[in-house]
């Protein structure tokens, strides 16, 4: 965040100041799913997280349940499931209880915001869960 004026000072104490994440400088990390990489931009002990994902063409996120609201903004490519397809510039949100399989036939890059970790039916842990 650039300061519009050089004499501006934060009025917030250190624990309430903005945290700037240089996402473009972060390396992509592998996930437990083939062809899917991520950058965890935010996560907390209550299960909230913001994750940038990159899915290779043909990659799949297997059957899972959203245990709380999940919001996704598609930056590149497209994501598909049984309920439809969303492409670059589209926003999709899913309520808690939504169950689906997501796939990216042509690849996709997207930002996802989770209020709680997903539950994978094959027992796989969520992206931010410790192994």
Task: Spell out what each predicted region is.
Residues 48, 70, 107:
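Conserved catalytic motifs of the protein kinase core domain
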